[in-house]
Amino acid sequence: MAMSDRIAVMNAGVLHQLGAPREIYRRPATAFVARFIGRSNVLDGVVEGRDGDVAAVRLADGALLRARVDADSTLGDVTAGQEIAVSLRPESLALLGAAPAASDRAEGTLHGTVTLIEFTGSHCMIGLDLADEHGTSLLMTIPDTDDLPRVGDVVAVRPDPAKIWMVAR
C-alpha cells in the first residue's frame, strides 16, 4: 500500500473497491475488503433506524452502535431492517475495564471475555470472545500498559464512533 496511489481490490474476478490506500483501509466497501486490507473485526448487524447520516446498528450480542452513513458508499441508502456488517479496526477500540452487568451496558460498548493477551513491544493485542450465539471474536490493539486485564476477565470496550464503518456483507 505504501507504493500505490490507487488500489483495486478484486475477489473471484469481481471488483469490490477502487481507491487510494488510506480510503480503502479506513472506509472499506465490503466485508471482503475490510478483511483483505489489514486486520478488521467484521461484525454482522441489522439497521434499527436512521437519523440523517447516522444509522443505529444492532449487533448479534445485543450491542447498539451508531455508524455514519456515507452517501457516496454502496450503503448510502441503508434503511431499517437491512442486514449489514460493521468494520472495526483493532486500533479503533478502547479498553474501558471490567464490564458492568449486562443490564447496565451503555450504548456503543461491547462486552467480551479476554482470550488472548500478546505483548508486541509498544502495543498489546487483546483477543475477546463476545457474548453472542455466533461465538464472535474481536481483536484489539492498545498501547502497552501495566494495567492489562487477564485471560478470562470480562471487559467492556468502546469503538471510536468516528471509525465505525458499515460494509456490505
Name every feature range the model reports, one short phrase each.
Residues 1-63:
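Internal alpha/beta loop-helix hairpins
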